[in-house]
Amino acid sequence: MVLPLFRRAAIARTSSLLRARLFAPASEFHSRFSNGLYHLDDKISSSNGVRSASIDLITRMDDSSPKPILRFGVQNFSSTGPISQTVLAMPALSPTMSHGNVVKWMKKEGDKVEVGDVLCEIETDKATVEFESQEEGFLAKILVTEGSKDIPVNEPIAIMVEEEDDIKNVPATIEGGRDGKEETSAHQVMKPDESTQQKSSIQPDASDLPPHVVLEMPALSPTMNQGNIAKWWKKEGDKIEVGDVIGEIETDKATLEFESLEEGYLAKILIPEGSKDVAVGKPIALIVEDAESIEAIKSSSAGSSEVDTVKEVPDSVVDKPTERKAGFTKISPAAKLLILEHGLEASSIEASGPYGTLLKSDVVAAIASGKASKSSASTKKKQPSKETPSKSSSTSKPSVTQSDNNYEDFPNSQIRKIIAKRLLESKQKIPHLYLQSDVVLDPLLAFRKELQENHGVKVSVNDIVIKAVAVALRNVRQANAFWDAEKGDIVMCDSVDISIAVATEKGLMTPIIKNADQKSISAISLEVKELAQKARSGKLAPHEFQGGTFSISNLGMYPVDNFCAIINPPQAGILAVGRGNKVVEPVIGLDGIEKPSVVTKMNVTLSADHRIFDGQVGASFMSELRSNFEDVRRLLL
């Protein structure tokens, strides 16, 4: 059988770079092509009747060390059997992309596809991009459903055929679509007769379990390495369809819905609702194909013991000579102090706090009831005046409440933990330079009043501040940059993208006004309101808060005259904006005589990375910013 001629554009719609087409007439060959600036390394091979063509690397050659620019997915061309098929893989649509989300399929199974047709929309780590077909034919099979998340690059997502009659002969699944290597994903089918089982912190004994799917904690953002189970929307035994929301997961950015990519029945919940810091890839639930298999999962030893193995019990605050299992996962500081003072065995006290926390009240109740056992390691520390638990029950309780200060443990959200970690790293690793200046607000306030009275346009002072900062960054380009730690170089940013600090219940979010220098003040105002509402409701998309070249933190609505903000890495600057205050200053009148006058002034403080901002760059930026406030017409240039 003659293999039909398949071809694929390596770089689509590129006039100045390189266009490459691959042909597969031989059993195997390896070719290289270079145009002096870019180098293409491709390989075409044939094995067991399946021809595979892959563009391994496109390399930039304008420096001493070749630098990878793009890596493409794999296409497999079957030349055996009654049909010829093309397997479309998840493409690498940005240099840093390793996973992608299939947002929407623009074509459905059976549709005719022409070269250049948009097959689907793929959400990368940067933006949502249209995935265009480089082949003509028919979309025979969609392997990855709409809404699927964290699909690895080169993962097969669809199958195309040349003839419409071949659609019915396309297999339901593809084996070896990623060079025959099995990858770990958020959904993996586990069967008793499989020779390889998923390795994780929980590995059930599959010998007595029916075929099932292990749901793992997914990576719902590029920086996520652990998450919290906020809520389970499905309970054990419920029927699940593809696309059903199983639960809510709190990431380091927001609380997101976790949708099922499988249909079946929720047989077992391994991680209970409210669990925190669950590692990405850790099993959280089991799904079976039919309702009859649910009882087999529940009655098996693996299914009944998996929940216990999920919880991590920290070391007790006191030595435990016995092997008695502790009934808690955390101990509050007050409870820890009481246990040490009374020489108690922590494992003998029952915890009643949230998520298995041992509280001070639990220890007091155990002392009063005499149920708490003494620790053998604390006998040497006993005071002579100490009585037995039964005799001290009436006196120990009031003495405890009088000697200890009352407080409440407040568990941090995942967002606050990430913020705390990054701000600490920022202060430790970035040399902060601080510059302050007072700017006159009267021209800005008059301009704002004129917009509202004469044109019906309502904008806030913060909206005008964003525009003023963006124009200053455009005019002082050295201030719109970041530090490349690997190379030790300053990287200048082409666009001015302003991150604005928005306080939410779960922590500080920084949505981005992109290309702020090119937008009108009214457009900035509308976008700020929309992004702030999304941030407070936890519905920001990744591209709406990731990135940014400069930040603004405005506390002018509070009685805060001035403050110093901490740089948000990898950015190099953040402007702290205080409130406006009326002050009396000498002003030269039209007659040339200096007279006292009341003006409104506002303090702004620049926190800058001293590796990028030296004194001259920082002063130039502050001078431009001050000029923008004094003459608002500069914002229209």
Curated annotation (Swiss-Prot):
InterPro entries: 2-oxoA_DH_lipoyl-BS, 2-oxoacid_DH_actylTfrase, Biotin_lipoyl, CAT-like_dom_sf, E2/Pdx1, E3-bd_dom_sf, PSBD, Single_hybrid_motif. One of its GO terms (biological process) is pyruvate decarboxylation to acetyl-CoA. Its EC number is 2.3.1.12. Its cofactor is (R)-lipoate. Binds 2 lipoyl cofactors covalently. Residues 1-84 form a transit peptide. SUPFAM superfamilies: CoA-dependent acyltransferases, Peripheral subunit-binding domain of 2-oxo acid dehydrogenase complex, Single hybrid motif. Residues 171-210, 374-408 are annotated as: Disordered. Residues 176-196 have a biased composition (Basic and acidic residues). Residues 330-367 form the Peripheral subunit-binding (PSBD) domain. PROSITE patterns: BIOTINYL_LIPOYL (PS50968), LIPOYL (PS00189), PSBD (PS51826). Transmembrane segments: none annotated. It is found in: Mitochondrion matrix. It catalyses: N(6)-[(R)-dihydrolipoyl]-L-lysyl-[protein] + acetyl-CoA = N(6)-[(R)-S(8)-acetyldihydrolipoyl]-L-lysyl-[protein] + CoA. GO terms for cellular component: mitochondrial matrix; pyruvate dehydrogenase complex. Keywords: Acyltransferase, Lipoyl, Mitochondrion, Repeat, Transferase, Transit peptide. Coiled coil: none annotated. Residues 85-161, 212-288 form the Lipoyl-binding domain. The active site is at H610, D614. The modification N6-lipoyllysine is found at K126, K253. Residues 390-403 have a biased composition (Low complexity). The keyword Cell membrane does not apply. One of its GO terms (molecular function) is dihydrolipoyllysine-residue acetyltransferase activity. The pyruvate dehydrogenase complex catalyzes the overall conversion of pyruvate to acetyl-CoA and CO(2). It contains multiple copies of three enzymatic components: pyruvate dehydrogenase (E1), dihydrolipoamide acetyltransferase (E2) and lipoamide dehydrogenase (E3). Belongs to the 2-oxoacid dehydrogenase family. This is Dihydrolipoyllysine-residue acetyltransferase component 1 of pyruvate dehydrogenase complex, mitochondrial.
